[in-house]
């Protein structure tokens, strides 16, 4: 890593940590590299809510809006629960489901800010195809590559 790249990353981590301190969390987008789907995830939410959220397969603008919406929705509740369908999160009346994430390997910025020992539960927001069928349910038209289940 060059000195310029190191300086950029150091500054980015500093700004991210400062924003988390001011607002409680950030949403970190990870763009597609052409071989994997984009995803966005919260960092810092575990300090107030006890968990983090992630959404795969949608661009950062959409995922950012959905994740912020869910943070507000869960603020005064027990939080996500597995396989519960939630209304009013996506446009056109589509529901989302929540599922626990099995591996935390994709959340490197979280580890960079909070350390390797920080392992809060991550909940994935799963969205359906245009017929309302969720992956991995039979008949879902969304491929594993299009919306990886973490």
Residue ranges and their predicted role:
Residues 39-43:
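A structural motif
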Residues 1-31, 45-49, 54-150:
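Acidic, proline/glycine-rich low-complexity IDRs
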């Amino acid at each position: 890593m060059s000195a310029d790249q190191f300086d950029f990353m150091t500054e980015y981590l500093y700004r991210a940590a400062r924003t988390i301190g001011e607002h409680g969390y950030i949403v970190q987008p990870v763009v597609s590299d052409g071989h994997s789907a984009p995803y966005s995830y919260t960092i810092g939410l575990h300090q107030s809510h006890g968990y983090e959220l992630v959404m795969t397969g949608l661009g950062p603008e959409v995922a950012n809006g959905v994740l912020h919406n869910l943070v507000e929705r869960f603020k005064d509740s027990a939080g996500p629960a597995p396989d519960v369908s939630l209304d009013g999160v996506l446009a056109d009346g589509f529901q989302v489901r929540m599922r626990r994430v099995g591996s935390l390997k994709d959340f490197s910025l979280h580890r960079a800010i909070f350390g390797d020992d920080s392992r809060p539960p991550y909940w994935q927001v799963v969205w359906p195809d245009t017929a309302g069928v969720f992956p991995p349910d039979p008949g879902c038209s969304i491929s594993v590559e299009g919306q990886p289940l973490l």
